[in-house]
């Protein structure tokens, strides 16, 4: 009887520990807030909301997958470095192997407001600009991740 009670106590302890390893919505929101702060001061601030939402989810999923126990992530001394590494990985992935998704980082409307693209540019002209930009970026950076780090 004593062994059964001890066994039940151990099982209850293990189950309670495994349940506490999952991230709560509050913990996810804390990481999202950090990502939003990062977005405000980085080159990805021009991403459209839907694309940024996908990037945010990728980063959160990457970190949560690497650190299923939020407390271990929260206690990291290099927590910001971990976040930056996940960000670089996800942005590099979202740019694409041929830098075909540069418009996600640099939307044409933002480039027109900044005076980089003329306001009346046609779709063909905008596509030609992105093709040229992708070519120049490929000349300077071998991989999308290298380009992302440079941003």
Where are these regions (language model features)?
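Mature extracellular/luminal domains of secreted and GPI-anchored eukaryotic proteins, especially small
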Residues: 19-151
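Sec-dependent signal peptide recognition
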Residues: 2-7
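C-terminal motif of bacterial Sec signal peptides marking the signal peptidase cleavage site
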Residues: 14-16
């Amino acid at each position: 009887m004593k062994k059964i009670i001890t066994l039940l106590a151990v099982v209850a302890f293990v189950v309670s520990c495994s349940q506490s390893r999952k991230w709560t919505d509050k913990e996810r929101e804390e990481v999202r807030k950090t990502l939003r702060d990062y977005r405000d001061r980085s080159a990805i601030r021009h991403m459209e909301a839907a694309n940024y939402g996908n990037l945010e989810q990728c980063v959160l999923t990457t970190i949560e997958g690497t650190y299923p126990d939020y407390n271990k992530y929260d206690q990291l001394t290099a927590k910001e470095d971990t976040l930056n590494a996940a960000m670089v990985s996800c942005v590099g992935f979202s740019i694409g192997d041929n830098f075909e998704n540069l418009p996600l980082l640099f939307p044409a409307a933002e480039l027109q407001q900044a005076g980089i693209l003329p306001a009346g540019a046609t779709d063909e002209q905008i596509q030609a600009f992105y093709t040229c930009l992708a070519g120049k970026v490929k000349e300077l950076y071998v991989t999308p991740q290298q380009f992302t780090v440079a941003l």
